[in-house]
Amino acid sequence: MEITASLVKELRERTGAGMMECKKALTEANGDIDAAAEAMRKSGAAKADKKADRVAAEGRLGLAQDGGKAVLVEVNSETDFVANDDNFKSFVNAVAAAALASGATDVEAVKAAKLADGRTVEEARATAVQTLGENIQIRRMVNVDTTGNIGAYVHTNGKVGVLVDLIGGDVELARGLAMHVAALKPPHNKAADVPADFVEKEKEIELAKMSEKDKAKPADILEKIISGKINKIVSDVTLYGQTYVLGDTTVEQVVKAAGADVAGFKLLIVGEGIEKVVEDYAAEVAKAMQV
């Protein structure tokens, strides 16, 4: 039977395997797509290793919390299709629960943690690779262990998650702050957390942008102008300096009014820092058929 491009594409969509793997399986199965798919499932363990070098930039965040302890884990997949699969969602939630229960503080510890069924997270991940047909990776985890209030929030699409450590105040305020961080994504907590080299660089930029007339002003006046601009920039990049999304005053004012203090926060964004590969499936099929 002729192995057509459409047949290869259909098998790829069913299995998530590479074009060349699909073409080879179809050739060995004499064009029987069901037999080819079954053969590829049987060789799933080998495929799991091959998938490890494929870019996994999609995925979801898993959240688990128990009192003053909470954990966020990032589990990556190759496509949004798999990220929205119920089996993948269940796996992510199970990973988060295992991470919390085990007291894991890094990814390697998460991988070694035991799930409710007795398997390690790593063993379950390898099975998920076979079942879902994509490179699945446990990429990052963050946790908070506090005597204060935890604001835990994961956006409905599972792509952005936040843990806020609030000393004082209440859980409602802590969650509101977590939602704020998820929405505006401030790089820093307070002005004191902003790196000095960032501030100096911004001063240089603001000075360079000034007109010659302004630069000619007395040094004390010039310093006040630049300081005002820098204060605005620092406010924009800090949680405390931003206007609270659920109010009309700054976060600092809201927190202080509650007699509280934000000890810190953790923000995860799925796929952040990963270079995504834009695939041309038509070209990939054509290339596979030429071999």
Curated annotation (Swiss-Prot):
GO terms for cellular component: cytoplasm. Its main location: cytoplasm. InterPro entries: EF-Ts_dimer_sf (IPR036402), Transl_elong_EFTs/EF1B (IPR001816), Transl_elong_EFTs/EF1B_dimer (IPR014039), Transl_elong_Ts_CS (IPR018101), UBA-like_sf (IPR009060). Residues 79-82 are annotated as: Involved in Mg(2+) ion dislocation from EF-Tu. Signal peptide: none annotated. Keywords: Cytoplasm, Elongation factor, Protein biosynthesis. The keyword Cytoplasm applies. It is found in: Cytoplasm. The keyword Glycosyltransferase does not apply. SUPFAM superfamilies: Elongation factor Ts (EF-Ts), dimerisation domain, UBA-like. GO terms for molecular function: translation elongation factor activity. It comes from the Bacteria. Associates with the EF-Tu.GDP complex and induces the exchange of GDP to GTP. It remains bound to the aminoacyl-tRNA.EF-Tu.GTP complex up to the GTP hydrolysis stage on the ribosome. NCBIfam families: tsf (TIGR00116). Belongs to the EF-Ts family. This is Elongation factor Ts. It comes from Stenotrophomonas maltophilia (strain K279a). The gene is tsf.
